[in-house]
């Protein structure tokens, strides 16, 4: 399923937060992006059903291989554009 820009933003945030903190939860993504918790929960549901993330019972968000590949691609593109 193709990603929209907002989905890319969420995946990139998860990647960055995972590198900074290790464990990532929805509240971390909400704070990082400045979005409401309900908005993030909806986005996580879409990303999960699209196969980009999994969510553990304790609330941790993990990128799947497809999610990690997409997140790294977005991150590199943003780094290139900001240089």
Region spans (language model):
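N-terminal helix-turn-helix DNA-binding core of bacterial DNA-binding proteins
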Residues: 2-35
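Key DNA-contact positions within bacterial/archaeal DNA-binding proteins
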Residues: 38
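Short, hydrophobic-biased segments on the C-terminal half of alpha helices
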Residues: 44-45
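A short, conserved structural fragment
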Residues: 48-58
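Basic, amphipathic "hinge/linker" alpha-helix immediately C-terminal to the N-terminal HTH DNA-binding motif
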Residues: 59-77
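Amphipathic alpha-helical dimerization/coiled-coil segments
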Residues: 79-83
């Amino acid at each position: 399923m193709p990603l929209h820009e907002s989905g890319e933003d969420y995946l990139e945030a998860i990647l960055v937060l995972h590198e900074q903190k290790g464990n990532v939860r929805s509240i971390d993504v909400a704070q990082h992006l400045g979005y409401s918790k309900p908005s993030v929960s909806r986005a996580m549901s879409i990303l999960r059903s699209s196969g980009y993330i999994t969510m553990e019972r304790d609330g941790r968000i993990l990128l799947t291989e497809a999610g990690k590949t997409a997140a790294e691609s977005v991150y590199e593109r943003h780094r290139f554009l900001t240089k």
